[in-house]
UniProtKB/Swiss-Prot annotation:
Annotated GO CC locations: small ribosomal subunit
Subunit field text: Part of the 30S ribosomal subunit. Contacts proteins S4 and S8.
Extent of Basic and acidic residues compositional bias: 170-181
Organism: Ruegeria sp. (strain TM1040)
Descriptive protein name: Small ribosomal subunit protein uS5
Keyword rRNA-binding in annotation: yes
Length: 187
């Protein structure tokens, strides 16, 4: 059966490609008080990423757990951001993110360090494709705030190429010289 296109030229009935991995971070039972008592439902927090530099998070509420997870996953796919990765495994520079009372510090790490991060931050780094990072969260331990603070910090990351382009310089002019550092240490 041939695929048909709709009026806007988009493919119809196209299944979502399984290029994204997702991780359920938190699931809570929530209640709404109504005239006759309480109505219970579920809230899900999901992180989605392609493990190649794109990540997003979403939250969904529903009366059943699978429906809440589905809603959260759809929202996460709509809210994805792109983060430049150094050598496809770590961050380009140290950064700081904040949301509410949640503060997060993220530092680059040498190869083989692994992901040193707690709870929700680890899920974000794994879905992003980061293999080496050291991070610390201070303040709020609420998973929503921790993820938002992490995303806030990741949005601030800039690759040396983009910084050089903005300044009108070459990448080599911005990065520290490798040959000069050991020579200065010996003197």
């Amino acid at each position: 059966m041939a695929e048909r296109e709709n009026r806007r030229g988009n493919r119809r009935d196209r299944e979502e490609t399984p290029e994204f991995a997702d991780r359920l971070v938190a699931i809570n039972r929530v209640s709404k008080t109504v005239k006759g008592g309480k109505r219970f439902g579920f809230a899900a927090l999901v992180v989605v990423g392609d493990q190649k530099g794109r990540v997003g998070f979403g939250k969904g509420k529903a009366k059943e757990v699978p429906e809440a997870i589905r809603k959260a996953t759809e929202q996460a796919k709509r809210q994805m951001i792109r983060v430049p990765l150094k050598e496809g495994r770590t961050l380009h520079h140290d950064m700081y993110g904040r949301h509410g009372a949640g503060k997060v510090v993220m530092r680059t790490a040498p190869e083989g360090t692994g992901i040193i991060a707690g709870g929700p931050m680890r899920a974000v780094f794994e879905m992003l494709g980061i293999k080496d990072v050291v991070s610390k969260s201070v303040g709020s331990q609420n998973p929503y705030n921790m993820i938002r603070a992490t995303i806030d910090g990741l949005k601030k990351e800039q690759s040396p190429r983009s910084v050089a382009q903005r300044r009108g310089k070459k990448v080599a002019d911005i990065l520290p010289k490798r040959d000069e550092a050991p020579a200065e240490a010996e003197a």
